């Protein structure tokens, strides 16, 4: 079993619906988390998850803030520092690594 982390803190549903943060607050959470993890990733590879739900951040009035956060991350992808992908693609990649790289393989 391969587990790709599901984020509780960088998750639009509890942040916006339960804690009543604004969509701009959520976008700042995304970029702050990203910037800090980018710095930490200089020492070891890291995975950053963002949980998005269409009924929350997918609402048109919230999309602009999300777009700004994603564009911030894309600038780093375009210079080869990050890989933006989906959990299934990470799982496929991990399963193709040499035996012993992934614990339990």
Regions found by a protein language model. Give the residues of each.
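Active-site-adjacent pocket scaffolds in enzyme catalytic domains
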Residues: 1-44, 103
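C-terminal domain-boundary segment and adjacent tail
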Residues: 31-105
């Amino acid at each position: 079993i391969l587990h790709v982390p599901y984020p509780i803190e960088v998750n639009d549903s509890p942040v916006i619906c339960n804690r009543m943060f604004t969509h701009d607050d959520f976008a700042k959470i995304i970029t702050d988390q990203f910037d800090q993890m980018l710095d930490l990733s200089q020492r070891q590879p890291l995975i950053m998850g963002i949980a998005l739900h269409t009924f929350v951040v997918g609402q048109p009035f919230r999309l602009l803030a999300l777009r700004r956060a994603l564009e911030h991350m894309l600038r780093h992808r375009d210079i080869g520092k990050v890989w933006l992908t989906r959990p299934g693609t990470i799982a496929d990649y991990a399963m193709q690594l040499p035996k012993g790289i992934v614990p339990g393989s």
